[in-house]
């Protein structure tokens, strides 16, 4: 499916997109907490953050709340999602949050940043595009900058992948996810291009990242990071 097609899927029902997130990401608190923990504490009073595949601005809001002097640029390929993000931040200080419609897997990333983050987005692009993206993220980071990605991963074998899927269904239902929400999630998953965690951390190193860390892994969900060292 084309990027335009994927964007359409993620524009449908955007008003209620965040409501079932805690049920559909069974490890929600630990997952997002691990992303925030990997944002360096010693960056100073103000630093620039790029949020790839920002969607409705959920992760951007968490970053902004935990780092109140950060400046967050949110990019996404769905206009509807970005409209929801703009609404989320409509009462925030002028200029602290910016929004850009773009296909981050194909277009050059704008600006330069101390931190690049992403949550549950990069698994939508092909593996070759992931590798190109990691190189592009490395390019826009300042020396010492950090890339943190929290995403869905592929099981290392077909048996593990099937176990991940069945476990996700069971846990989502136990947490109260409705069948309509599960069906919508399954429909979106038809476009997924998940890769194993081992592959992704390898691509990070290929792109030039140092200190690549696998911080969190819970079946389908993982968080990892890397730092751009000075040449």
What are the functions of these language-model segments?
Residues 1-16, 168:
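N-terminal, positively charged/glycine-rich alpha-helical extensions of SAM-dependent methyltransferases
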Residues 11-29:
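Class I SAM-dependent methyltransferase Rossmann-like catalytic core
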Residues 108-116:
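A short acidic, Gly/Pro-enriched loop at the edge of an enzyme's catalytic core
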Residues 131-143:
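A short glycine-rich, Lys/Arg-flanked "PGG" loop and its adjoining helix->strand segment in the class I
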Residues 210-231:
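Core SAM-dependent methyltransferase catalytic element
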């Amino acid at each position: 499916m084309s990027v335009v097609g994927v964007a359409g899927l993620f524009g449908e029902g955007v008003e209620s997109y965040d409501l079932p997130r805690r049920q559909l990401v069974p490890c929600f608190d630990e997952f997002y907490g691990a992303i925030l923990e990997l944002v360096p504490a010693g960056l100073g009073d103000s630093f620039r953050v790029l949020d790839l595949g920002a969607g409705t601005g959920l992760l951007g809001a968490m970053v902004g709340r935990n780092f109140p002097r950060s400046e967050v640029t949110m990019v996404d390929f769905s206009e509807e999602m970005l409209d929801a993000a703009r609404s989320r931040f409509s009462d925030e200080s002028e200029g602290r949050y910016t929004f850009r419609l773009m296909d981050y897997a194909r277009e050059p990333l704008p600006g330069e940043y101390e931190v690049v983050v992403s949550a549950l987005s990069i698994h939508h692009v092909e593996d070759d595009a992931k590798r190109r993206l990691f190189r592009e993220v490395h390019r826009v980071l300042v020396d010492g900058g950090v890339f943190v990605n929290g995403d869905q991963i592929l099981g290392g074998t077909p048996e593990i992948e099937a176990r991940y899927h069945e476990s996700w269904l069971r846990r989502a239902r136990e947490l109260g996810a409705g069948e309509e929400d599960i069906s919508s999630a399954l429909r979106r998953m038809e476009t997924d291009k998940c890769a194993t965690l081992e592959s992704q951390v390898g691509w990070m190193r290929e792109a030039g990242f140092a200190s690549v860390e696998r911080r969190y892994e819970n079946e389908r969900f993982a968080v990892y990071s890397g730092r751009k060292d000075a040449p």
